[in-house]
Amino acid sequence: ALRQHLLRLQQYTKKDMIYLARGGFWSTAPFIFSSVLSIALVWAFANLLPKDIYGTYKFVMTLSGSLSFLTLTGINIAVTQAAARGYEGVLPYALKIQLRWNVLFTIAMFGVAGYYFIHNNALIGTAVCILAVTFPLTTSFNTYGAYLFGKKQFRQIAGYQIFTSFFYIAAMVSILAVTDNLLFIITVYALGSLTPLLFFYYRTLQLSGEQSQFLAEQKAQFLNYLKHLSVMNIFSTLSQYVDKIVEIRREIVNRDK
């Protein structure tokens, strides 16, 4: 019955409504799954972690997010577009330029860590160093999802994202259940996020078969679009995090008085 309704609607929209319905379902399923699992993570943070440790955790994560504009934030959209155009070699090329460019983020984060070490706050300094190394890798290897989206592999993306969410949340709830050590928690956060992305990135490459050459003209189009998107994202990223940093920093200062 649903198929008949979609076919009837297709006569008016002139679009493949069955395809759109399938894509919509597989796009929504990971969001619903991760939202349900996130309830367990929220509960764990609220009940298993002291407020002062949680406040410091939020501060470190917000610091990392505020500098994320130094990564190529527009690359996933650019990769999706390139994959949709049939540029098969875009995935390894995108990883390569991200690993190079994201060094800026690592340098900036080490600078922030140095500030905290100088001011005798080794805890935050060490936590920032952990994210300085792992966050750029996470943002680089998650590009496989954008590639699969451009190739319209919605079911495959959904399966990968659901497993990734489960792996990360299970790891976080487990570490929160056994310790309130901030550095252990940050490390598990980093590895819990990165590990499944590494696996699914290389699996995507393997299943995609031999990658065709990414031609110079294709690279030029890709890079121009990528630069435009990334520059546009700088201001939105800064505006999103500046107020949060000030607010959380104020909470920490007031707590330590």
Question: PLM features: what roles do these ranges have?
Answer:
Residues 39, 43, 70-73, 106-114, ...:
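Membrane-embedded alpha-helical segments of multi-pass transporters/permeases
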Residues 16-76, 110, 165, 169, ...:
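Signature of the first transmembrane helix
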Residues 1-2, 32, 71-73, 95-120, ...:
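Alpha-helical transmembrane segments of multi-pass membrane transport and lipid-handling proteins
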Residues 2-16, 20, 155, 159, ...:
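Interhelical loop/hinge segments that connect adjacent transmembrane helices in multipass membrane
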